[in-house]
Amino acid sequence: MNSKKTCLRIAVNAAATVLACLAVAGTAAAQDIKARTMKFAFSLAADHPLGQGAQKFADLVAEKSGGKMKVSIYANAVLGGDSQNLSAVRGGTLDFTSMATGLLAGIDKRFMVFDLPFLFNDAREAYAVSDGPVAQRLLNGLSDHGLIGLGIWDLGFRNMTNSKRPIAQAQDLQGLKMRVIAAPVYIDMFKTLGANPVPMTFGEVYGALESKAIDGQDNPVGVILSAKFAEVQKYLSLTRHIYTGMPFLMSRKTWDSMSEPERKIILEAAAEAKAEERRISQAKEAVAIDDLRKVMQVNTLTPEAVERLRGAVKPVVDKFAGEIGPDVMQQVTAELAALRAKN
């Protein structure tokens, strides 16, 4: 009997010790999570999938930190355009931002691989490469430039709108003044197709379309809808010529100021928010097209027309493939070939 009591006492004491250790560990972890409010700014609308993803991220950070860590959302370029946001994040005066991959080409030319025309056939391919080893290596390299890459979110496949005519073939772009992202691939692609590319920040686009300073622009349908471009554009052509990913970027200064438990919260919240943002983006694409059909003339290109466009922009792809480098190009090509072989 005494032996049983002794064993029981030892077991109880051991359990108490374990619980005490866990409590101490939990207290230490809690102490490592400091109260802080961070800012997440971007150019798109709050009701766009990116905005909804940003809110999901903010909610997750608050939940996982017990309310200690907060993220304030600033949509619609209220703190500045993409270039200003990027500079602010690098400088540490802004904590988070997200923007098109093309805008990172000034930091690392290899990011241009994501902007090559007609590279991806569908979102499945785009997501696989965006989550793959090449993308991760490029994101990791941003730490040398004051940035932490937390993954690549989804903006979608770009389509063309304009106020003049439907775009069914390259010739239809002749002479059109088309707003483009201030990125080399976009500028050269539209030049090659006969348009006059006009680099412009996103916040300026609606006003330029309204005043007829430009004839058209290109964006995924979700952006076209949320930005209300249908109010100032008549034609939507579903060209799907470039897929645009949105790297989710964090200031390295903010990251370096964090404890390991805080970093863990950020990484977990970013991964969960990315999955949610992509889900919302995919769900909204078909709905957005249906909504835009009610207020715009929408045309879909034939497969033959798409192939002709692909052929027309091949010199652009070849040119920038050289700048991106054979290593990245070969790896991305291999990733896509492996994916397509599974179909």
What are these regions (language model features)?
Residues N2, N13-A16, Q31-E125, P133-V134, ...:
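N-terminal secretory/targeting leader peptides
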Residues M1-R9:
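N-terminal secretory signal peptides that target proteins for export/translocation
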Residues V24-A30:
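Sec/Tat signal peptide C-region and signal peptidase I cleavage site
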Residues A11-L19, A23:
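Sec-dependent signal peptide hydrophobic core
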